[in-house]
Amino acid sequence: MRKNNILLDDAKIYTNKLYLLLIDRKDDAGYGDICDVLFQVSKKLDSTKNVEALINRLVNYIRITASTNRIKFSKDEEAVIIELGVIGQKAGLNGQYMADFSDKSQFYSIFER
């Protein structure tokens, strides 16, 4: 149980840190979508059963969106994304089969706008 709490705490720290690093550029192509998803994920972290899978989907979404919009991250931003990737790797292939990583709606429930 303690291990899961550490992962949850780390995930919260890194998602918030990345959000704060990127929020100033939210009006640039792709950054707004990434910031929206980071905010959504940070809200869902406490209620999700599988933190690793959620973070894994987040990192995949960030990578696809960055590639599509030709976003170059700074060293600090990239370091945080790598730390999130380490957390996400613990999920293995859980939830990746036939997934659309570029779909932002995977982070929203049907009752949210």
Swiss-Prot record:
Keyword Isomerase: no
InterPro entries, per database record: LciA_Immunity-like, Ta0600-like_sf
Domain of life: Bacteria
Position of the signal peptide: none
A Pfam match: EntA_Immun
Keyword entries, A-Z: Bacteriocin immunity, Plasmid
Gene Ontology terms: biological process: bacteriocin immunity
Function: Imparts immunity to leucocin-A to naturally sensitive host strains.
Family of this protein: Belongs to the immunity protein EntA family.
Protein name per UniProt: Probable leucocin-A immunity protein
Organism encoding this protein: Leuconostoc gelidum
